[in-house]
Amino acid sequence: MALVLILQLLTLWPLCHTDITPSVPPASYHPKPWLGAQPATVVTPGVNVTLRCRAPQPAWRFGLFKPGEIAPLLFRDVSSELAEFFLEEVTPAQGGIYRCCYRRPDWGPGVWSQPSDVLELLVTEELPRPSLVALPGPVVGPGANVSLRCAGRLRNMSFVLYREGVAAPLQYRHSAQPWADFTLLGARAPGTYSCYYHTPSAPYVLSQRSEVLVISWEGEGPEARPASSAPGMQAPGPPPSDPGAQAPSLSSFRPRGLVLQPLLPQTQDSWDPAPPPSDPGV
């Protein structure tokens, strides 16, 4: 009996082995699926994340892969175009790059679709500190306009500009690029500025505040110092909500090491949460 069982296992092993060691055909054969993350690709530790793999045609089996691993990290056997992979209470160790593939039973052993585009999951308490620079430079001629660029490391983030002595955010931009530009009119450009960025939706993850940047008239000379030592500068407040939307709970986006100050009720004079493209700045 034991000999029969061993022979059966040896017979099944090639089929099982080829199923977890995928053979990828040319792209024209089986188009790649789409891989997305809910609630976001950037989350804080402890959040439940769902990775969704959507195939362009009904499939039978889906596999979730990480680079350097031959076998799928997770399997889902579903007779549909969508499979969900659940990552509960994620940790920083679960961050990284993911891809997914799908296959059908009539494709033969080990044949999978083209892999999806890369999805990078970032699990962190706070985002890296951005840089703040002036274009063309921090020393401007009288009446000249200046552009401030707040640059982070991630695309599709929301950027906030602060000015020393002003409690409310000065300008707010959402950018598909890993940076955002803020235009200051020459007559009001001189001053001390800092910026930060955050994920555009809850659960919010905030960056550290940038170092301050001093804009001055020619002959005055700029100076730079850490934002934490700048008088009148507060730690980043919570991301402003969309007009008409309920502001998220402050505790839902409190990053480690930051003391968040709630935003005061905003007026058109103090804050425009979504300046139009033609807005010349402050």
Swiss-Prot record:
Please list which residues make up the signal peptide: 1-18
UniProt KW keywords: Cell membrane, Disulfide bond, Glycoprotein, Immunoglobulin domain, Membrane, Receptor, Repeat, Secreted, Signal, Transmembrane, Transmembrane helix
| Keyword Disulfide bond carried by entry | yes
Cystines in this chain: 53-100
Q: Ranges of Pro residues compositional bias? A: 273-282
Top-level taxon in the UniProt lineage = Eukaryota
Where is the Ig-like domain positioned along the sequence? 22-116, 126-219
List the GO biological process terms.
immune response-regulating signaling pathway; osteoclast differentiation
**What does UniProt give as GO cellular component?**
extracellular exosome; extracellular region; plasma membrane; specific granule lumen; tertiary granule lumen
Annotated family: Belongs to the leukocyte receptor complex/polymeric immunoglobulin receptor (PIR/LRC) family.
Q: What is this protein called?
A: Osteoclast-associated immunoglobulin-like receptor
Annotated source species? Homo sapiens (Human)
